[in-house]
Structures are given as C-alpha cells and as structure tokens.
Amino acid sequence: MPRFITELKRTHSCGELTKADIGKEVVLFGWVNNRRDHGGAVFIDLRDRAGLTQVVFEEDVRPDVHELAGQLRLEYCVGVRGKVVSRGGNVNPKLPTGEIEVHASDLEIFNRSEPAPFQIEDKIDTGEEKRLQYRYLDLRRAPLQQTLMTRAKVNHLTRNYFTDKGFLELETPFMVKYTPGGARNFLVPSRLNPGKFYALAESPQLFKQLYMMAGFDRYFQIVRCFRDEDLRLDRQPEFTQIDVEMSFVEQNDVFDVMEGLVVKLWKEVLGIEIPRPFQRMPFEESMAKYGNDKPDLRFDMPHVVLTDLVRQHDGGGVPLMHEAVKAKGIVKAMRVPASANFSRTEIDKLEEYVKGMGAKGLARAKVGEGGEWTQSPLAKTITPALRQAINDACEAKAGDLLLFQFGKESVVHTVMANLRVHLAKRMGLIPEYGSGGAWRFLWVVNPPLFEYDEESGQWAAAHHAFTRPHDSDLQFLESDPGKVNCYRYDLVLNGFEIGGGSIRLHDPEVQARVFKAMGISDEEARSKFGFLLDALKMGAPPHGGIALGMDRLVMLLTGAESLRDVVAWPKTQKGTDLMTGAPGDVDARQLRELYVKSTFEPK
C-alpha cells in the first residue's frame, strides 16, 4: 500500500485552501494538471474534483523530494504534504486557491501516466469519438466534473424533497413482461424458460400504479428506463427519470408537488427564484399557436391559423390555400417583425430550410405602408379582402414579413414549429443552446386521449391507455373517439418537454371502454394487462402521477449542449459504447444455453 495512504490521510481538497489556512501543514491527493520549472524550483498545479492548488518543490527544503518532483509529468497521480504559504504579489484571481500555495516537504507518486490522447483542459478540440473512447479521461475535465456533481446534487435534493413530503422511495422491476406496441423494447432471453423473453422496462408505469392499489399512496423513484429507439442528440437507449405517483389526487395536486420540486432545484442549484404557479395552456392552443405541445415561450412570434378565413373568402384568389382547406388541411401564417430585416437571399435560405423538412415551399409576403403585399407571388392573385383579413389576424405592420404554410395539418404544424425556433435563433432572440437567462415553465394540459393511425385504421392511445378521459367526454368514447380529451399533462421548459404524466383510470368499466375504442378485444386486454384489470376491481383508489426526465433536467440546469454531456457513460447515436466495445459478440455455447440463434449475416 502507498505510504501516504497508510501513514497519512488527506486533510483538504485541492479547491478549498485559502489565506485563512496559511501556516497549516496539509496533505493533498490528486493529479498533476500542469508542471513547470522555475529558478531551481518545480511548480505543479495539483487537481482533484474540487479544484486546483499550486504546489512548490524547492531543492533546499528536501533535495530527495525535489529530485522526485523532477520526474512528475501530466496526469501522474500523487500525494503531497507541505505547508500553506501566501503567494504574495503573485495572486491568481481566477482560482479560489489563488492567494496561497503549498510548499512541499514530502511527495509520493501513486501512479505514473502515459501521455494522454488529448489535453485534460476545460476546452479542447478533440472529436467526440476520441473523448468517448477515453471517457474516464474526458471525465477528469472540470466542465464534465461540475456537470456530474450538479447531477448528484439534483439527486440528493430530489430525494430529500420527496422524503420530507411523506413519499416512499420504492423500487420496481427492470425485467418485465413484453407487451407489443409502444416503444421498442430491449429483450432478455430466459434460460430457465426456453423460448420466453423478458423486456427491460421502458418505464415503471404499471408497477407504480399497482403500488397505489397496494396502499402505498405516495411513491417516488429515481429510476433507469430502457428504449430501443433510433437515437438523436437528445436521446439515449438507457435514461433516468424522476418517477412519481400519488393516490387521492387531481391534476392540480400533482402540479403543486412538482412545481415545489422544480422551484427548489432552481433555487438550490442556480440561486434563481422561479415564480409559481406555472403558466397553463390547453393542448389545442399550443398546437394552433406554436405547432407542437412543447412551445418555447422565451420569445413571441406565434402562429395564426387562417383556415376559417380562407374558407370564408372562398379561397380569396389563392388556389393552393383553397385546395388545402377543401382537403381538410390547415393554413397557417407567422409574422416576423420588420426589425428582423431579412434580405431576399436570407429568405431564400429559409425556403431551403423548410423544404428539408418536407415542405413544398415557403410562401411569403412583405407588408407595405398601406397594407399591400410585395416580394410575393401571392400579391398578384389574392383578393384585397382576404389580404386585409390576414393582415388584421396577424396584426401585421409595415415592413413585417408574413410566412405561410398550408397543407396536411401534421406537416404544417411541424414545419412552422421548427421554423419559428430557427428564426428566433437567427434573430438572436434565444441562444443556440442553453436558457439565455430566461426560464419559461409551462403546463400543457387537456390533450386528446386518442390519435388516429391511418395505417391500421384504428384509434390508438396518444400516450398510454391508462389515462383518465374527461368525464364530459365519456359520451364520445364509442361514437367519436377523436373528441375525447383527457387528464394528461406535460411540463415544458424553453421548448423542451421535461416531464409528463396523467390522472389514471381507476374505474375498470371505463378502462374496458377505452380498450374497445382502441380496437383491443377483451381477450387481448386480458392477455396483456390481466393483472392490472384484476387489480382495478379490488378497490383501486383514484390516482395520478408524472415522470421528469433527469437527464434533460440536468442538461438545462447546466447549459449542456446534449444529453451525452450529462450522462457519465453515454452511448453513441448507433447505441454503441466506444470505451468498452458494447454491444459485443456472444459465444455460440452461451446462445445455445439461451435457446437463441442469430440470423444476422454480415455483408
């Protein structure tokens, strides 16, 4: 064992010594962050997760220690003993320890380091693949260490908050029954049950509801979940969520508890007071004004739905708009203020941008002093009455730019939603990443319970089949499922959905009606969810809950650019771990024991 470990103990971290510690003898452990020789003395910056301390090895104090210090190189792991002294006029104001240094009297090298494949510095140009391959070195860099320490603090604050509120931290299984539909699952073959498979849980949904039925009326868990989906910058195959469920509540009770948590996190982590209650917006309004159910409210530029106006004016001289309305599509406009002052070249680039999302083009018009339209093919055919009606609906002023999309509702919403955010970044209204100093929380409420699947010709649950419909909409369950709204809610922050939940169905008769509306027979429902249906008949209480995405929450709190920056050991967009080589091959013997055979044939 190293002498410093058995005989000496660390007295301080490398980030806590100040001038109040001058004269003390201290023991520090860490890594050599920097090394330089000056006037016969060896200087190093010693680093641990708390910060940096300058250490000086002088030849006339301990020649043997000075000689050993001459061997030090970057990333050597060492222990140092010495006295804290003032740096006099050589203060480094950038460091919390910048007023002092440690004059070393003893040194032990715990381990030497080969030259690192990249610099261990705050900002580096190394590609992400190399950093992921040597993730343990990447994690030595201060920005990532600060991010993970913030994540640990969020974990701690969350547990304390819910415990103080009377919640129980309870576990749910990772290996569960596979049920078709929903997210694609990771499957685990069962050796003891040949031909059978577990699924890794994509959420604790059913088990946390069963906790409510078992009488544990306040549950929470910081839990790992798994989804075998195509990955993006904001997705990982395994992710963490703050999972919550409560009995005897309505959605306002859930809002109250979760707003309390969010306010506490922003206060404790960032020192920012977030006002309550959070804004609420119906799903229908969110889609109409912003094109999605996670609007960024840090800036304005809402969409205006013109479908009824175009219908009232019988097309108003714009055949393409008229055709979209007759085809049961939608017509939308967005007013870009004159202050944006986009050139024709810039507007042409906007058209290329929307075409990349499947749009056929970008209709536009510049508003003149008298309300006339210029720089627009629409101006040649549109009737003065429809033009004025659109100007009024959009509150257009001279110099403003009007942008239009019309066609299939889902495409128009998506294109206009993305265009709005793209424009805001181009105009400097929001930064490319991070909050830009503003935090606009929003509850999006009352969405449809069902969405129509054109391929299957069936209604499907927009989220899951266990969400409670509005009582006033139960009359439409059989006759017109598209009219049924529900007690589902999403918590949105600056264009990101950071959580979602619902009030659950606790009435077995209504649950059966919901399944039938989705085309799920009694036999299929019992095969998939028989245990839950039985539990609903055993005095199930009214209950509801929510889950917050821990990874995204920390990403927003820290200003990170992607989820991979807030996860210690992330996967690539192909789902691979470049450090360990996962996923890897399995030998044939093990596959035989699992009764599994690979049909993959390499090209």
From Swiss-Prot:
The keyword Protein biosynthesis applies. Keywords: Aminoacyl-tRNA synthetase, ATP-binding, Cytoplasm, Ligase, Nucleotide-binding, Protein biosynthesis. CDD domains: AspRS_core (cd00777), EcAspRS_like_N (cd04317). GO terms for biological process: aspartyl-tRNA aminoacylation. It is found in: Cytoplasm. ATP binds at residues 227-229, 236, 497, 549-552. It comes from the Bacteria. Residues 205-208 are annotated as: Aspartate. GO terms for cellular component: cytoplasm. It is an enzyme of class 6 (ligase). L-aspartate binds at residues 227, 463, 504. Its EC number is 6.1.1.23. The keyword Aminoacyl-tRNA synthetase applies. Aspartyl-tRNA synthetase with relaxed tRNA specificity since it is able to aspartylate not only its cognate tRNA(Asp) but also tRNA(Asn). Reaction proceeds in two steps: L-aspartate is first activated by ATP to form Asp-AMP and then transferred to the acceptor end of tRNA(Asp/Asn). Belongs to the class-II aminoacyl-tRNA synthetase family. Type 1 subfamily. HAMAP family: Asp_tRNA_synth_type1. This is Aspartate--tRNA(Asp/Asn) ligase.
